[in-house]
């Protein structure tokens, strides 16, 4: 095995998906703690400490306690290199989340044991299913009251349409939480709460059929043994291939806050989740062990660091290796660039990178030339597929409070649109600026970021736009004819693409009927 193949085999790149408040930020911290990437796991939102989770770094996130933007963290664990991507937990951020999930090889689903499967989890699982992403499940908050675990597994199967195979099983919950039993290997892991940055020593009781186990479970012993018989009779057994195919999820129980069970999940990712996988490009399939470098940009993030007014493009490496100072071809522009200052992300700490391999996520400084979906190679013209833009569902007209700041407004919106935080449209017949979003919160985010980062205050006005469609037409003459007739509703988006802003559903249906040669697209691949 070459050194490069060995490095790729060590990589595990995964994202955490959950409904807001299921404990995603806490679990992120505890995972980093396992990899010793942060020394103090600050309890998020706690009154005792004002330390915020390092992955929730933007002002607005700090106020609302939701991770609005994906951040990337790399840390070592058991001779492996883990790349952890945090996804926005709020329902308004489906585009950003979708694109993040195109950059990973597996996902960790965190469920609140008291609530079970929630709407946001369902939406994220739908996205994972599009790519058959393997899912590891963690049922969290066993230090509180939870629903019946068998009921929770049934719900995962019924609602998320995936087989659930419990690997560990909880012994009690809330004040009676005594630990978990490992179903396949017949041992008990005793619960001792470890808060903050404490990593408690694990106490193991070998064999359920032992005096020590009987003493630990006390009066609950007989009932627990009966429950286990039921579980083992009714539940699926773990099957590696079904997991890799995205048809079965191994389920673990624990409490991230009490620092218990998180290591079981990380072990599962290392032992079972796939190493970096091959990627489909328009031209061919790219294997991770190929010598030549290739990668695609799945996210652009403005102002990650108030100290540096900058934009960072996040790139997933698909093949080869990155070496500091190497020359790459920016395929869309057909330009060669030398990249000497790529970054890796150790939580919110940035470090200059010397080398990186397939599966790693690196950050490139972006001075406005890089767009989402861009491919970088060592010369080959490749375009990776499946990184879409979605048509927004909500629209607002932007009104400036200070008319002298229109230049800053345009610049700010252009940058925010580039990173996928919003979509911006410039109608051909007016000087209006129209914003499109997938959820209402996105408008708040844009307004607060314009104010914080670009010193521009704006207000929103309602506008009669039902939906946007990207226009495509092979017949130049027909396209010109269409542009003349439909000019009242035509706009150009932030990337310069012609867009039809349909005032109503009926109008769109009529236009599609009237112009059969014109394609009205609801999604647009990033070219």
Swiss-Prot record:
One of its GO terms (cellular component) is cytosol. Keywords: Cytoplasm, GTP-binding, Nucleotide-binding, Protein biosynthesis. Its main location: cytoplasm. It is found in: Cytoplasm. Pfam families: EF-G_D2, GTP_EFTU, RF3_C. SUPFAM superfamilies: EF-G C-terminal domain-like, P-loop containing nucleoside triphosphate hydrolases, Translation proteins. The keyword Protein biosynthesis applies. The keyword GTP-binding applies. InterPro entries: EF-G-like_DII (IPR053905), EFG_III/V (IPR035647), G_TR_CS (IPR031157), P-loop_NTPase (IPR027417), PrfC (IPR004548), RF3_C (IPR032090), RF3_dom_3_sf (IPR038467), RF3_GTP-bd (IPR041732). One of its GO terms (biological process) is regulation of translational termination. GTP binds at residues 18-25, 86-90, 140-143. GO terms for molecular function: GTP binding; GTPase activity; guanosine tetraphosphate binding; translation release factor activity, codon nonspecific; translation release factor activity, codon specific. Residues 9-277 form the tr-type G domain. Belongs to the TRAFAC class translation factor GTPase superfamily. Classic translation factor GTPase family. PrfC subfamily. NCBIfam families: prfC, PRK00741.1, small_GTP. HAMAP family: Rel_fac_3 (MF_00072). Increases the formation of ribosomal termination complexes and stimulates activities of RF-1 and RF-2. It binds guanine nucleotides and has strong preference for UGA stop codons. It may interact directly with the ribosome. The stimulation of RF-1 and RF-2 is significantly reduced by GTP and GDP, but not by GMP. This is Peptide chain release factor 3. It comes from Pseudomonas syringae pv. syringae (strain B728a). The lineage of its organism: Bacteria, Pseudomonadati, Pseudomonadota, Gammaproteobacteria, Pseudomonadales.
């Amino acid at each position: 095995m070459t050194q490069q193949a060995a490095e790729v085999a060590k990589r595990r790149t995964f994202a955490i998906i959950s409904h807001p408040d299921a404990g995603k930020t806490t679990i992120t911290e505890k995972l980093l703690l396992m990899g010793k990437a942060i020394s103090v796991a600050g309890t998020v939102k706690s009154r005792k400490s004002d330390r915020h989770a390092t992955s929730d770094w933007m002002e607005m996130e700090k106020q609302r306690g939701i991770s609005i933007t994906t951040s990337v963290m790399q840390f070592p664990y058991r001779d492996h290199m883990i790349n952890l991507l945090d996804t926005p937990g709020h329902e308004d951020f489906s585009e950003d989340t979708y694109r993040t999930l195109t950059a990973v090889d597996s996902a960790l689903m965190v469920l609140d044991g008291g609530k079970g499967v929630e709407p946001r989890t369902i939406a994220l699982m739908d996205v994972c299913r599009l790519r058959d992403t393997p899912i590891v499940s963690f049922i969290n908050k066993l230090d509180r009251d939870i629903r019946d675990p068998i009921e929770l597994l049934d719900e995962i199967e019924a609602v998320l349409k995936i087989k659930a195979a419990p690997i560990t099983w909880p012994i009690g919950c809330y004040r009676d939480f005594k630990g978990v039993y490992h179903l396949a290997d017949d041992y008990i892991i005793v619960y001792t709460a470890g808060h903050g940055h404490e990593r408690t020593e694990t106490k193991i009781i070998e064999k359920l059929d032992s005096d020590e186990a009987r003493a630990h479970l006390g009066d609950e012993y007989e009932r627990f043994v009966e429950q286990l018989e039921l579980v083992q009779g009714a539940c699926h057994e773990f099957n590696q291939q079904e997991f890799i195919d995205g048809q079965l999820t191994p389920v673990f129980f624990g409490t991230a806050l009490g620092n218990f069970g998180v290591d079981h999940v990380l072990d599962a990712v290392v032992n079972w989740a796939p190493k970096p996988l091959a990627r489909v490009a328009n031209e061919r399939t790219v294997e991770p062990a190929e010598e030549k470098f290739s990668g695609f940009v799945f996210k652009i993030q403005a102002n990650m660091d108030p100290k540096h007014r900058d934009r960072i493009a996040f790139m997933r490496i698909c093949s080869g290796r990155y070496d500091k100072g190497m020359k790459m071809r920016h395929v869309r522009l057909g330009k060669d660039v030398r990249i000497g200052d790529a970054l890796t992300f150790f939580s919110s700490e940035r470090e200059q990178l010397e080398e990186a391999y397939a599966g790693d996520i690196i950050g490139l400084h972006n001075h406005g030339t890089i767009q989402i979906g861009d491919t970088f190679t060592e010369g080959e013209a490749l375009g990776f597929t499946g990184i879409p833009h979605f048509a927004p569902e909500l629209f607002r007209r932007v009104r400036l409070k200070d008319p002298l700041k229109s230049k800053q407004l345009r610049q700010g919106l252009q940058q925010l649109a580039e990173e996928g935080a919003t979509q911006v449209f410039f109608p051909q017949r007016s000087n209006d600026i129209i914003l499109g979003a997938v959820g209402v919160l996105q408008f708040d985010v844009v307004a607060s970021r314009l104010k914080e980062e670009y010193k521009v205050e704006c207000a929103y006005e309602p506008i009669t736009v039902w939906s946007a469609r990207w226009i495509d037409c092979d017949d130049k003459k027909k396209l010109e004819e269409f542009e003349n007739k439909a000019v009242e509703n035509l706009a150009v988006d932030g990337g310069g693409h012609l867009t039809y802003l349909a005032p109503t559903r009926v109008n769109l249906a009529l236009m599609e009927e009237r112009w059969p040669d014109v394609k009205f697209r609801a999604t647009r691949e990033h070219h």
